[in-house]
Amino acid sequence: MRKWILTWILPSLLYRSCFHIICLVGTISLACNDMTPEQMATNVNCSSPERHTRSYDYMEGGDIRVRRLFCRTQWYLRIDKRGKVKGTQEMKNNYNIMEIRTVAVGIVAIKGVESEYYLAMNKEGKLYAKKECNEDCNFKELILENHYNTYASAKWTHSGGEMFVALNQKGVPVRGKKTKKEQKTAHFLPMAIT
């Protein structure tokens, strides 16, 4: 008779102890849940911007990146001291260094660091430069699957379609009316300054 009682009590004790351990672990995890997701990510060290080469944090606003915009047609976007927008193949040209400032989620303003002119697009889709930033200077930045970025006017469209910043095979700006997201003339790679 005693054998039967011991074998009956033993599983009961095991289940109770497992239940208490589960409750204890659950309480500890709830106590640690006071941290924000950013704090938890920092503790785990898997979501810091240093670890990701293509961080999307800049799309949230206020961030400034200094880059050279290299078009898939092998030209760097350039804004010279007179405000002329065109392409250059000289990598070490100071007029192709751009300041990309986030003004809203997914919206950026592009400014030539040396020339201090902002890139702008008018309603006909012509690229030009302005000393003062306004709505013509706002572009929707989109990261494509091929890792290139496109910059479409945030203000202007043509027949319901977006108008993109683009450089042709000769480094000449293409009017936004003639551009599409899929064209390589509108694909830019933001390159870090070395």
Curated annotation (Swiss-Prot):
One of its GO terms (molecular function) is heparin binding. Gene3D superfamilies: 2.80.10.50. It is found in: Secreted. Its main location: secreted. One of its GO terms (cellular component) is extracellular region. It comes from the Eukaryota. InterPro entries: Fibroblast_GF_fam, IL1/FGF. Disulfide bonds: none annotated. Glycans are attached at residue 45. GO terms for biological process: positive regulation of cell division. Keywords: Glycoprotein, Growth factor, Heparin-binding, Mitogen, Secreted, Signal. Residues 1-31 form the signal peptide. Belongs to the heparin-binding growth factors family. Plays an important role in the regulation of embryonic development, cell proliferation and cell differentiation. Required for normal branching morphogenesis. Growth factor active on keratinocytes. Possible major paracrine effector of normal epithelial cell proliferation. Interacts with FGFBP1. Interacts with FGFR2. Affinity between fibroblast growth factors (FGFs) and their receptors is increased by heparan sulfate glycosaminoglycans that function as coreceptors. This is Fibroblast growth factor 7. It comes from Cervus elaphus (Red deer).
